[in-house]
């Protein structure tokens, strides 16, 4: 059975519009409760590479995060946290002043930092058979990935698959770049990581994306779309097509 990827055309960061589109996207995927059981402990994982002005398209836009948080709360999901293994700074420091902190306060969602890494064995892995994952991640029942559409110096693009690298604890992220130095080996490791953590849903903010010297120093470019899927490879394949890349080259 082929994976389903939902494309949601959207040209601006207006909360009501994004909220409505995300609800439509969830309906196309079978409904929120078919993806995430009621009562589940949920971790929201945006792209929080570093502290930057929202307009620079470095991080997942706060309105996208806020609209999805609103949907979860309105549907009765009680146990929600937000976290990322940020490239620079703490989670709270990166989101402070972006507007994301305001949304989290409104919907009573704590922004947490990872405190401890736990060796996690994944024997099914092809490239990587173990990861050091945060204790706080392993305490959750399910993960929702909220990625940002960007270029990437090593992997050409950073999207749904690459967003999961923020699950690797602390300095082990830097170690991974040494351990898997080529684009191919790093990409295969990322696939193993996604299968190991197994986020239940992937949402991509591509309303304003990043081109050029990504993932942190590129230029904002309007792509006017959000994407949703339960399959990160399928989602990134569509992303690749949108920017005229062959998916097999990524």
Q: What are the functions of these language-model segments?
A:
Residues 1-250:
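N-terminal and secondary-structure boundary signal
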